[in-house]
Amino acid sequence: GIIISPVVGGIIGLLAHLFVALRTGFPLSLPVHILVALEMFVVVYITSIIFNRGKVILAGIVGTLLNGIGFTFITGVFMYFVLGGMNPVDFLKLLGLPLTLASLVNIVIAFIVSKGLKNANIQV
């Protein structure tokens, strides 16, 4: 999304999540992973738009918090009401920190790669 268009980046995020979930057997169920894949599209799309407007730090913060906290809670709500899973707050307590840290690491890596490609004058 930050190297290519936000829409294409979002589609890549969506498909990447589905492929990883498929390889692990959709451990939280197919409906949950479809929701998470759609959330990946949204977070990559929004983060890319903010990044491409030159607000790199804001993009990192928004992407990290949206993916790590916001969408984790939304997924917890979905699991609770649709699938009868654990309380959404407990789901967030369980997964919020590790997913937020993973999101931060992924976003920092994407920003570094983007800067490296830009400095090397490589266009994708």
Q: How would you describe each model-predicted region?
A:
Residues G1-V124:
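Loop-helix junctions at membrane interfaces
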